[in-house]
From Swiss-Prot:
Record keywords: Ribonucleoprotein, Ribosomal protein, RNA-binding, rRNA-binding, tRNA-binding
Annotated Gene Ontology cellular component terms: cytosolic large ribosomal subunit
UniProt-recorded name of the protein: Large ribosomal subunit protein uL16
Record organism: Shewanella loihica (strain ATCC BAA-1088 / PV-4)
UniProt KW Zinc keyword: no
Length: 136
């Protein structure tokens, strides 16, 4: 699972997921999976989608993961009264804004890349679209 090696502080405020994304262009590969909606991806969802793509392309080509889960999400145990401090870190998430490129792929045909990204998109909780690299 993806998570930071070390952080200055273990727990984080909830914050808000507003604004526009950085990393909106396909920069490493030929094809990309771009977020259309707004939301957050857990480390498990990112890994699950990566595995689905890797299996479908049968380890040909190359895949880049353009997102990293760097925000800790805490929760208190079941049946615990309110108060007594913030809960323990349960999992890590990456906040996604519209336009963010999540994955990139290279070295495979467009048809195969499109199928692989469709499988990956089924694992993710946000709407996505298939994009290709634009040549300037």
């Amino acid at each position: 699972m993806l998570q930071p090696k070390r952080m200055k502080f273990r727990k984080m405020f909830k914050g808000r997921n507003r604004g526009l994304a950085n990393g909106t262009e396909v920069s490493f590969g030929e094809f990309g999976l771009k977020a259309v909606g707004r939301g957050r991806l857990t480390a498990r969802q990112i890994e699950s989608a990566r595995r689905a793509m890797t299996r479908h392309i049968k380890r040909q080509g190359q895949i880049w993961i353009r997102v990293f889960p760097d925000k800790p999400i805490t929760s208190k145990p079941l049946e615990v009264r309110m108060g007594k401090g913030k809960g323990n870190v349960e999992y890590w998430v990456c906040q996604i804004q519209p336009g963010k490129v999540l994955y990139e792929m290279n070295g495979v045909s467009e048809e195969l890349a499109r199928e692989a990204f469709t499988l990956a998109a089924a694992k993710l909780p946000i709407k996505t679209t298939f994009v290709t690299k634009t040549v300037m």
